[in-house]
């Protein structure tokens, strides 16, 4: 197996194909990683969540990272890492249009709301949960691909 970097175009294509990734944030030098449903646009990533540890931590430290991948097997995979800044879209006077845009994009993924609400079993609890739409303003994107030995180009 060989691991090679992929182009920005290939990174963008993967982020458009997949809708689940892992969001990393940190507080007081302690990292925290959770799965999230997301929707990608060239300059940002939209995510929906309920209020909890990750939102509290990102409010304190807005530097975040998102990792998404496609895995065939241990020697055939592609991974993309996005770094950026957390921006909450729940301030009505500033972000109503962006929040609605995020909702429309995320609604294209039929499971977009399930991850944040998966812990809630009771309908009353779900309706009382504070929800948060946010975006990651992208600072950098990079990616790697693992190529199985049999697929490596032969040089003469």
Identify the residue ranges that each predicted region occupies:
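Short, solvent-exposed loop/turn elements at beta->coil junctions and helix N-caps
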Residues: 26, 69-72, 120-124
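A short local loop/turn or secondary-structure capping micro-motif enriched for an aromatic residue
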Residues: 41-42, 54-57, 74-75, 97, ...
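Short beta-strand segments
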Residues: 18-50, 66-67
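Surface loops and adjacent helix of pleckstrin homology
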Residues: 50, 69, 146-148
